[in-house]
């Protein structure tokens, strides 16, 4: 069991891990009283989902990747591009750790697979900004990094994140 998996297994004991693995659709279901997947989770309001943690985690992932590739004297922009994409987070990381089995979400409204679909390119070669149904999975992965940071912020959070992200770079 690697470091990220250890944190995933703390879902029942760590509030921030539980929050990281709670999509907004689960919060909506719980508020309406029909969440059957995780009855014990009680959200006070719609902010109690993984959105805020995801923003924090996304920033930490980018910071770490920039630092890592800078120290290796590699092209930061090119090297980090792959590892910070939603496609990598969904198709590689989430799939490897089977995140969907741990994530609280409304499976009637969201896909229950890891088949990330690229949105395509515009005529000028830029990525289209259309909605991707699998984004919520990447959000959960980013939120987990945010939660891990918060759990370790008074200790050596950088070391914990470093171990996890280095492990991610070896997953195919």
Protein language model features and the residues they cover:
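Double-stranded RNA-binding/processing signature
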Residues: 1-172
